[in-house]
């Protein structure tokens, strides 16, 4: 067996593995939705590609992953350029510095961590220059942890009221990172806060 054949076999096995993993995750989502009385079609699976090579992402695309999330803008930008021949929809899920908005505006389809009017203004300006618009989620710090980005819950309503002025930002909803804890009640509390905030908007 030559090296090229070995690489092809490895890629085929990776494709099978990714398809199997996707099926397992989707089944877990279906089971959880059934238990909660929720429609599985209302849940969106977004694979996060942090530290994963572009070659493996190409295989993941073949397995059915057509949307991918990245938390670092530089890594996302590099991957989007290498994989420009594939119509991947890129979601930036991490904190964005104002000076990096120009990069996001060139390729991303979605930004899930908006928590600053300064960033909103810069991103809107850059998107207008590119002739593009993207979907945006407002990040909320529902756990109150200082190590996390996001707006405090009490600031969300006022923040959202300022967003219609940014015509290139399509506000789709809220995003949070719940507290990382084995205490399910503490985790659930974060999502209850989010539901309450959503009800006020």
Report each predicted region and the residues it spans.
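Conserved alpha/beta-domain cores
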Residues: 2-201
